[in-house]
Structures are given as C-alpha cells and as structure tokens.
Amino acid sequence: MVADVLLTHFNQLFCLNDPGHPLTGQEMKKATIVEDGYIAIKDGLIVALGSGEPDAELVGPQTIMRSYKGKIATPGIIDCHTHLVYGGSREHEFAKKLAGVPYLDILAQGGGILSTVRATRSASFDNLYQKSKRLLDYMLLHGVTTVEAKSGYGLDWETEKRQLDVVAALEKDHPIDLVSTFMAAHAIPEEYKGNPKAYLDVIIKDMLPVVKEKNLAEFCDIFCEKNVFTADESRYLLSKAKEMGFKLRIHADEIASIGGVDVAAELSAVSAEHLMMITNDGIAKLIGAGVIGNLLPATTFSLMEDTYAPARKMIDAGMAITLSTDSNPGSCPTANMQFVMQLGCFMLRLTPIEVLNAVTINAAYSVNRQERVGSLTVGKEADIAIFDAPNIDYLFYFFATNLIHQVYKKGQLTVDRGRIL
C-alpha cells in the first residue's frame, strides 16, 4: 500500500495496544515507546507504524515525506470535560477568590454559574460561536483534537438549545471533533429557586425529548452537589435520560460527598467528574460499575484548594481515570491541556505514561470515540500531536510552555509551528 503521507524518524512514538476497555491499575503504567518511529497515513487513517526505515511499498511518487528528528508523537490529546460555550467572563470574582471567599458563597451572592447564565442568555448565536471558536483554536494549537462540550449556562430551553446549536455548528466547521453533552441541570435557575424538582420536570418533559429527537447531544450530565442538586434529584433526572437513550456523566464529590458517586455506579454512568472528595467506598463502587473517573486538577489549582482528587489511590485500586481542563469562565478559566497534564504529574503524582494514557485512550473511551481515536493504532484516524521534545518525560519536565510543533487531524497537517493552517 502506498501512503499519502509518511512521517519518519521520530525520537519516540507513544503507542499502546488498546485492550478493548479503558486502562485500569497496572495497565495505566504501560505503553510501547517506539524509537526512531514512523507513521504512514492514507485516506486520513493510520495504515502502518514502525521503527527505522519504512517499508519501500509505502513510498510512491505522490507520497509526502516529512522527517521529525528530535521530535516525539502522541495521539491527539482529548479534552473530555469542558464548558465550552458561554457568554461573558468572571475575572471580577478573582479578587474574592484571592480573599478566600468560598465558591458556594460566591454562587449564593448571585455570582458563579448564575452570573454566566445571565451573560449567556443575553449573548447571540454569533457571539457564542466566535467566542467558542477562539477557545477551540487555542486548544488545537496545544495539541487537542477532540473535545467534549457541555451546555448548562442557559438553564432555559432557548439558551440551552443555542449552546447546543453552537456546538453542532463548530463540529461541522472546526478541525476539532466535538462531543456534545446536555447539562441544563448545571444549577437551579433563579426562577426555580427553592423548587429544583419542578425545574427537573421541565428538563425531563420539555427539553430532553427534543434534544434526543434532534440529536443535539449524546450525553446528559448533572451537578450533584451541596446547594445544587441532591443525589435523589440527580438519580431522578439521569434515570429518565438513560431511558431516553442518553449516555450519562455526573459532576460528583467536588465540594462534598453527598451520594453522586452512588448514582454514577447505580446507573452505570460512563464517567463521574471532579471526585476531589471521593471516599474509599466511593472508589470501590466506581470500579465495580466500570465508571471512569474524570479528574480536573486545574480546577483545584484555580480555586486555590489543597485537596486534589486522589488519583494515585484510584489507579492503585484499579480504577480507570482521565484528566480534563474543566474549561469554564469561573472555577477553571483555562483551555490548556498541557498544563493539566503537567498538574497530573506535579499535583496528582502520576507518571508521564499514566498521564498520557489518561488523556488519550481513556479519554477516548470517556467520550465514546475509542474506535476512531485515542491511540496510534493501525486503522484509527491519524490524529497526531507532534511535540518539540526529545522524549516523553520532557513534556512534563519542561512545564508551562506550549511544546506543540505540529498537529495532524484525520491525516491533514492542521497546525504548523504556532499557526492553524
């Protein structure tokens, strides 16, 4: 087979044999590091991988040849938890955070999520589209090729749908692949204050059926937390969503452990997100149910909290984990997955291989894209992040710098030395 594109002489390729399930426990520590590696691409797919000189049959008169001495390649990075589409910003809350005002107190004062809800409700489709596109551009320039994007800053049907429509439009227009999550249950809107059950009924009866009918989202999510939605309320919504055919995610155990992990396990959610306050019993329940733990260390960093999710304990117990940005305007205003990956080492005490497995193959399982992306594997899409680094460890050792040299998306050179092509 003659390749369309042949990428050769990488210092290292980060490869693995996808076992057919999210990596857990000791599997997280394993990868195949191919020295002097090459990748052959045809019709947007990886058709060959190896070390040294490529087979002669891969090279034809039209084959594009590029050499990458001194560089490494990983699968395209996957950010599987973002709040991508929103209006406004919340830098005016930063001084309160520095003064130690708790997040839930800011929310109770009309700030936090509800502040962004007001800004998002007043924002036009075009405003939201352009703002979200800029974030996606930034992500792409840092090596991200697939992004999960939640609604949740409307808390009414008109605005929630506008957010989902923006995601759908960007999925068509932008190189990054987007996976849509419906999260109208991100907070209790002011018009339903004191009556969350009534709001959930509106979501179940009036919103979810239309989202499903129009295929606007693949996942449904809820914020199960003190002063937001209880475990029973979360179970009520997610069970109805599951009956309608949605895959499930849940924000759980971020500030307090109030039963969200139990709901995730009972309903076999694909992932439980945050988990800073998870207990040993909660870890065991998620392992038993096969729920992926989606950890968001940049949120803990941004909130200036001391308690990070117990990633080391989770992996050692046999749990599958991912890492994501939680990109949002309040608790985590970043879109930099390289920073998150470095926090995975510095603050969660994970090894570089564990972090890379978390943000590639496990993240692909978290967004139900494991058949297409998440590993440098023959037959998968050629989503490739190429770093200006001599080896895998250097990605984490030399921190706080964008080390991306190039990005390939579906076999097309999409980013080249700081420019989107």
UniProtKB/Swiss-Prot annotation:
Residues involved in 4-imidazolone-5-propanoate binding: 90, 153, 186, 254, 331
EC number from the UniProt entry: 3.5.2.7
Enzyme class: hydrolase
Record CDD domains: Imidazolone-5PH
GO (cellular component) term, any one: cytoplasm
Metabolic or biological pathway: Amino-acid degradation; L-histidine degradation into L-glutamate; N-formimidoyl-L-glutamate from L-histidine: step 3/3
Main localisation: cytoplasm
UniProtKB keywords: Cytoplasm, Histidine metabolism, Hydrolase, Iron, Metal-binding, Zinc
InterPro entries hit by this protein: Amidohydro-rel, HutI, Metal-dep_hydrolase_composite, Metal_Hydrolase
Protein's GO biological process: L-histidine catabolic process to glutamate and formamide; L-histidine catabolic process to glutamate and formate
MF terms in GO: imidazolonepropionase activity; iron ion binding; zinc ion binding
Annotated residues for binding of Zn(2+): 81, 83, 251, 326
Subcellular location: Cytoplasm
Positions bound to Fe(3+): 81, 83, 251, 326
Family per similarity comment: Belongs to the metallo-dependent hydrolases superfamily. HutI family.
Job description of the protein: Catalyzes the hydrolytic cleavage of the carbon-nitrogen bond in imidazolone-5-propanoate to yield N-formimidoyl-L-glutamate. It is the third step in the universal histidine degradation pathway.
Name assigned to this protein: Imidazolonepropionase
